[in-house]
């Protein structure tokens, strides 16, 4: 029986609708709108597309959005000074610095400079540490979105063997903490992992976030597994994931499509986090 599709498009619409409803409720009480500052350094085309999508979502949901499109020549100190000003701005609840930054700017230093209560990307060491200690507040958007997608399957995650392919700070590592928090037994694989196939084949829940098209053949998938494909790759003018979708969907019980799976959830959770940050500041 072919896998059931987990639609991030549908779920993200529901989450955004709920966020917009709450914002309207606050506005009707005479309160200010949540505020989000979006910083883009340079003119990377992919980053411009992502930032545009985030700004449109803010507009749709009633979030006050302030844009800072800085030239590629911007120095690290200039960026840190702007972040410091936004940290102090009572109208701004969330600060988003679009990554990647130009090579001359230290991304870690920039992330650490954002106030943890305004870190709606969930990348600040303080927020990652809280997740590690099982007391999360603002959580990384893509892993949190994936947890929401997993909830829709109705599968009890306790005791499930979750395997993550990819150990990035943005997805793989916080994803491991999220799944651990949910009661899974977690294996994280990376470029030094030996015999990747055997690890993948043991996965009840497989999360792949590498950014290499079809790196995971469908035949590796365990019968009945839940497959979450985070990869977005362009091949011959089409968007494809990191998992060989057609073959994997014959073996999996649930699978996310590319596009329309994890992608829409990331922006939805960004809006969700902005609302959370706003509520904590109110």
From Swiss-Prot:
Instruction: Mention one GO molecular function.
Output: methylenetetrahydrofolate dehydrogenase (NADP+) activity
Q: Which GO cellular component term is one of those annotated?
A: cytosol
Q: Does the keyword Hydrolase apply?
A: yes
| CDD domains xrefs | NAD_bind_m-THF_DH_Cyclohyd
State the pathway, as annotated in the record. Answer: One-carbon metabolism; tetrahydrofolate interconversion
What the entry lists under SUPFAM superfamilies is as follows:
Aminoacid dehydrogenase-like, N-terminal domain, NAD(P)-binding Rossmann-fold domains
For this UniProt record, the keywords arranged alphabetically read as follows:
Amino-acid biosynthesis, Histidine biosynthesis, Hydrolase, Methionine biosynthesis, Multifunctional enzyme, NADP, One-carbon metabolism, Oxidoreductase, Purine biosynthesis
> Per its UniProt record, what InterPro entries does this chain match?
Aminoacid_DH-like_N_sf, NAD(P)-bd_dom_sf, THF_DH/CycHdrlase, THF_DH/CycHdrlase_cat_dom, THF_DH/CycHdrlase_CS, THF_DH/CycHdrlase_NAD-bd_dom
**EC numbers on record:** 1.5.1.5, 3.5.4.9
Q: List the disulfide bonds.
A: none
A biological process from GO: L-histidine biosynthetic process
Q: Its domain of life?
A: Bacteria
Instruction: Indicate yes or no for the key word Amino-acid biosynthesis.
Output: yes
Q: Which residues bind NADP(+)?
A: 166-168, 232
Task: Name the catalysed reactions.
Answer: (6R)-5,10-methylene-5,6,7,8-tetrahydrofolate + NADP(+) = (6R)-5,10-methenyltetrahydrofolate + NADPH; (6R)-5,10-methenyltetrahydrofolate + H2O = (6R)-10-formyltetrahydrofolate + H(+)
Q: How does it assemble?
A: Homodimer.
Family recorded in the similarity comment: Belongs to the tetrahydrofolate dehydrogenase/cyclohydrolase family.
* Summary of the function given for this chain in its UniProt record: Catalyzes the oxidation of 5,10-methylenetetrahydrofolate to 5,10-methenyltetrahydrofolate and then the hydrolysis of 5,10-methenyltetrahydrofolate to 10-formyltetrahydrofolate.
HAMAP family registered for this protein in UniProt: THF_DHG_CYH
Q: What is this protein called?
A: Bifunctional protein FolD
- What species is given as this protein's source? Histophilus somni (strain 129Pt)
